[in-house]
Amino acid sequence: MRRPQAGRIALSLFLAGQATPLTAAPAANAQRAASCTELSTATPDWLIWNAMSSDWPGSGGGRVQLFANHIPTGELSSCNVNYRMNATDGRIIGHDPTAAHACINFSGTTALNTSVQLDMDTLLLTVRSSWICEGDETARYAAAGSANLQRDTSPGACIVEGTLYGDSITCPIADVEVEGELLGVS
């Protein structure tokens, strides 16, 4: 019997963890067939996937983490919104819904800058990006769009883990497409 190699196991686990983005893949693949410049003016949208919220009330904080796939460029950004919590009752405190949080771009060939704003009371997410399409470095596009996130707190959906400061609670957030509006081309 052949013994599995660590690299193959890691690759298998990595690929298995990518099940979430594949649910949105048919639409994304069809749109990727069009050029970046066409999509930049017609559908400057984002696919938000693999999002989750993690609360650590006992330690006084939490965060929402998500991945934003930019449709025109096909580039992926990782975004985190950190917030403070009251250690006694777990309420979110001092959160500025207008604060912009820079995302980390897993850049390939485009110049993509993405940021998010998140209103923790309504879970309204606003995404903003500016980018240049490969092969057309003369035009810089900018777009913004908003969508409400849906946090799943149904029984069994969230993971509760004990820590030194009390329980941490991690809940999934449903995938969503954010329809972008082109703000300008310079």
Spell out what each predicted region is.
Residues 22-186:
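Mature, structured extracellular domains of secreted fungal proteins
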